[in-house]
Regions:
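N-terminal nucleophile
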Residues: 1-174
Length: 174
């Protein structure tokens, strides 16, 4: 699983820490609570995204009022992707409210943070059939375009290249 963030760094870091211990509890058919679902035991990426959304809401409940009094918005978004054994690759965009959407063949990628300058590069080149190495190059060109067009965007950049069904990655570019 890979987690990328944009927005308020302190919120992102808090969510990341809460995510380590966050649990979802569902009521089973017998009316009793089932076993907790965590980021570590989720049986699907959808369930893992639900746990992430719950962690975002947990931090919101804890910090939003104090941020508001300081004149700050609760501003965070995440790209969350990966693969759970037995399931295909999945990619989610998680919003500040903890709700999320999933990538589709019509929307095969997500961006967080400043996107208007680099997005046209991606829209013109990427398709679901784009080879992985070409897609990685395209992502780097998109990020470079954004950095050159907007002075508030800068290093560091992180890029993870993951091949479906490997259940590991050996290419992390920073």
């Amino acid at each position: 699983m890979v987690l990328l963030s944009a927005g308020n760094l302190s919120i992102s870091q808090s969510v990341r820490e809460i995510l380590q211990i966050e649990e979802l509890r569902e009521i089973g058919e017998n009316g009793q609570p089932g076993p907790p679902i965590t980021i570590w035991n989720a049986k699907s990426m959808f369930d893992a995204a639900r746990v992430l959304g719950s962690a975002v809401r947990h931090v919101y409940d804890r910090d939003a009022e104090a941020l508001k009094h300081a004149g700050l918005d609760f501003n965070v978004s995440f790209i969350f992707g990966g693969q759970v054994r037995g399931e295909g690759m999945r990619l989610f965009l998680v919003y500040s409210a903890g709700n999320f959407i999933e990538a589709t063949t019509e929307t095969p990628y997500f961006q967080v943070g400043e996107s208007k300058y680099g997005k046209p590069v991606l829209d013109r080149v990427l398709t679901p059939e784009t080879p992985l190495d070409e897609a990685a190059k395209c992502a780097l060109v998109s990020m470079d375009s954004t950095m050159k067009s907007n002075l508030s965007v800068g290093l560091p950049l992180d890029l993870v290249v993951y091949e479906a069904n490997k259940l590991q990655t050996d290419r992390v570019i920073c």
